[in-house]
Amino acid sequence: MTVLPALPPLDDLETLNVHLETLSAENRVCWALEHGPDHPALSSSFGAQSAVMLHLLTRFAPDITVILVDTGYLFPETYRFADTLTERLKLNLKVYQPLRSGAWTEARHGRLWEQGIDGINQYNTLHKVEPMRRALEELQVGTWFTGLRRGQSSTRTQTSIVQRRDERYKISPIADWTDRDIWEYMKHHDLPYHPLWEQGYVSIGDIHTTRPLEPDMREEDTRFFGFKRECGIHENI
């Protein structure tokens, strides 16, 4: 493994990212685990290609905390997929849910996801952003690993390998990976795609705001009726 210097101060992140771009994803993970702040954790949606990051991180940190935000509206296949990967990879899974149930929210606000972009944003804040923010704070996560990739959407093309968010470092070790890189890693390690992958679902979130990819559609149009790609977690935290 390449020997790397200790984490530089915030004003040197640009230099650090230039250096990290030359390393493998494995070495980026090892560097972050060694030099990043305490209490590392990986957030996972248990989506289409989530097995890659779960496998990559647990190779080097078998007991790393894995955070799943259960909105209450995930696909049944997602819950079962989470069970499968948790058993196979012996995941230290922590599930966080909204402070109020979906029924509570619907009774007071209706189906927010059907109320245009403002309703979608409010829904995402209540059911995704708040639970993730609470998880990171309660678990005192200092180094937050994500599976963000630049090729996933137009909103992620500038994703850095390491970012500073408040007092936390956010690490995206496969930021530069292509779909081909993902496929090769999964094939090499015999990892499963999400069960809905074979039905054309390439980005999998909640059951009411996710649709399969169709001809002439962009991947990011399969979420939130094409209004937006991001759920707010990686925009606001």
From Swiss-Prot:
Transmembrane segments: none
Pathway entry: Sulfur metabolism; hydrogen sulfide biosynthesis; sulfite from sulfate: step 3/3
Domain of life according to the entry: Bacteria
Active-site residues, as the UniProt record annotates them: C231
EC number: 1.8.4.8
UniProt KW keywords: Cytoplasm, Oxidoreductase
InterPro entries: PAPS/APS_Rdtase, PAPS_reduct_dom, PAPS_reductase_CysH, Rossmann-like_a/b/a_fold
Gene3D superfamilies reported in the protein's UniProt record: HUPs
GO molecular function annotations of the record: phosphoadenylyl-sulfate reductase (thioredoxin) activity
A GO biological process held by the record: hydrogen sulfide biosynthetic process
Keyword Mitochondrion on entry: no
Reactions that this protein is recorded to catalyse: [thioredoxin]-disulfide + sulfite + adenosine 3',5'-bisphosphate + 2 H(+) = [thioredoxin]-dithiol + 3'-phosphoadenylyl sulfate
Record's subcellular location: Cytoplasm
Any one Gene Ontology cellular component term annotated for this protein: cytoplasm
Family, per entry: Belongs to the PAPS reductase family. CysH subfamily.
HAMAP family: CysH
Function of the protein: Catalyzes the formation of sulfite from phosphoadenosine 5'-phosphosulfate (PAPS) using thioredoxin as an electron donor.
Protein name: Phosphoadenosine 5'-phosphosulfate reductase
Organism per entry: Xylella fastidiosa (strain Temecula1 / ATCC 700964)
